[in-house]
Amino acid sequence: DPSLYGRMDFAWCGNAPVKLLEYNADTPTSLYESAYFQWLWLEDARRSGIIPRDADQYNAIQERLISRFSELYSREPFYFCCCQDTDEDRSTVLYLQDCAQQAGQESRFIYIEDLGLGVGGVLTDLDDNVIQRAFKLYPLEWMMRDDNGPLLRKRREQWVEPLWKSILSNKGLMPLLWRFFPGHPNLLASWFEGEKSQIAAGESYVRKPIYSREGGNVTIFDGQNNVVDHADGDYADEPMIYQAFQPLPRFGDSYTLIGSWIVDDEACGMG
């Protein structure tokens, strides 16, 4: 099943190898800012003289998204959906819908809450049209746990992102990568809850739910196992992983994280 996009998050201090923090393979946001507004900033900064006029930016995200939607072309309408009362998600979905339209796709928007079930379990819109394919900015694990989750196994419609992305978006991927490639310079030591720690005594570490969004329920511990920082959220009941703590570089009052964007299987920009 085809995929659309994802974002790998890296920490880099400038004098040591870049470290992979996690892979947002299912519902990455900040796409609109990275693909569109970041490019507007570049053009404004050139004009104002903040940066040289020949300065460039590694950013082909929008072009690659449009190209990818062209590759996924079908005469069937492409539905785009997210939850109600989620302004950031709505903006991201509208942006992706616009990219699809630029690629020649017929697109329609519908809220997740308005999706219906027709005869035989087919997915329908508010006009009872059968939905054949849809992009959803809605976590796959939530879909699987919904009352109608078992219908996903019957695969009557094509979802973007596809079901296999639920594996890559699971932060359990990080301990597995460390197990397969121990000591890799671009990985952080990681382990599952209940396993032996993969860092030396006295080193700081992080606890993360295997599924979470925007840092929800992430906890930072110092080398004496004291909580240094904690983010509340809705994911406290998820299984946890542990990961060596990697501080982000600080510039003034800001901490910088590299979001490396991937469209299909091709890196195409940072933001």
Predicted regions and their residues:
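Domain-scale recognition of functional cores that engage charged ligands
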Residues: 13-15, 30-33, 38-271
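Conserved metal-phosphate-binding beta-hairpin within the catalytic cores
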Residues: 1-27, 258-261
